[in-house]
């Protein structure tokens, strides 16, 4: 992170969290959940420049793309959303793009917060059906 934060360059940051993974593990077993994560990670890796995707938790990933134009970054995000746009498994995505890496920690916090808001919205939409817990 330090290597980016000193640069005066554009940067896109995204947090991705796979919604419904616990339910998939409970219903189909952890092998199915692991396969989903491996497949999803491979798809994400093919969607972003090499070396910019990081797994930060069980089902959480972060993307940090320096030197990327805003339109290109939005295309990357849309491709990721489309990949995980399934009723049984959607990804919560929060992202930020900025002209400067100077305040990278604040950008990361904002993208993370937006991901949690997206995740909460997903679970609220499915709460009445009793489909998901978190």
Positions of PLM-derived features:
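Catalytic-core segments of nucleotide cyclases and related cyclic-nucleotide turnover enzymes
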Residues: 74-81, 85, 96-134
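Flexible, nucleotide-binding loop/lid elements of kinase catalytic cores
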Residues: 11, 28, 94-96, 125
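Conserved long alpha-helical elements within nucleotide-processing catalytic cores of c-di-GMP signaling
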Residues: 1-12, 19-46, 54-58, 62-63, ...
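Conserved Rossmann-like nucleotide-binding pocket used by diverse enzymes
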Residues: 14, 64, 94
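Short beta-strand-to-loop capping motifs
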Residues: 63-68, 97-99
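PAS and PAS-like sensory/regulatory domains
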Residues: 87-92
């Amino acid at each position: 992170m330090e290597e980016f934060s000193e640069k005066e360059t554009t940067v896109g940051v995204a947090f991705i969290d796979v919604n419904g993974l616990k339910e998939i593990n409970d219903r189909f077993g952890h092998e199915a959940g692991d396969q989903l994560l491996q497949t999803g990670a491979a798809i994400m890796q093919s969607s972003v420049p090499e070396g910019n995707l990081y797994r930060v938790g069980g089902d959480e990933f972060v993307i940090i793309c320096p030197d990327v134009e805003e339109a290109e970054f939005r295309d990357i995000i849309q491709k990721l959303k489309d990949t995980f746009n399934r009723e049984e498994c959607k990804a919560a995505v929060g992202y930020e793009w900025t002209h400067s890496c100077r305040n990278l920690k604040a950008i990361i916090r904002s993208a993370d917060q937006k991901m949690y808001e997206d995740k909460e919205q997903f679970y609220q939409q499915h709460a009445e059906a009793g489909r998901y817990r978190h």
